[in-house]
Amino acid sequence: MTQPQARCLILACGNTLRGDDGVGLWLAEWAERRFAEHDGVRVIARQQWTPELAEDVARVESVLFIDCSVDSPPGSVRLTAVEPAAAGQGIATHHSGAAGLLALARDYYSSLPKTAQLLTIGAGSTELGEVFSDAVQAALPKACKMIEETVLRFPAL
């Protein structure tokens, strides 16, 4: 029996060996448990977003990207709309950001999700280690709540 096509993709990245950089993967595991009974939601967790993921992005109605941010205050949780990178803008061949993946979906699969959001959690430390900073640890409940609310608001869910 084939699984139904997901309408919503949660695409998280991070590195569990670099402190707060692993928060995206932790949140992906949480989302897999939270939406396990929800046929319309698919979760993919990777160390990096690679161009191959553009096909997955092109096949859904909504996508939620999750990552840490070294440019935001530690423990801050932000949700922003994401637009595809402009045509002709350089897109890395080994790893891509959210805007780059949307551009690849548009350019190579002629399809874009109706809704694309990026949830970032400000990193306090990306030093070697598997423990989150106090700021990121304290932000986890807020991040989980924002993921849940965002996914349940997506069209067709």
Model-identified regions with their sequence ranges:
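Non-catalytic beta/alpha edge segments that cap or flank active sites
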Residues: T2-P4, A156-L157
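Short alpha-helix boundary/capping segments
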Residues: G19, Q89, T93, V131, ...
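Phosphate-binding/catalytic loops
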Residues: L101-L157
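Predominant activation on well-ordered alpha-helical scaffold segments within soluble catalytic domains
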Residues: L25-E29, A54, A99-L102, C144, ...
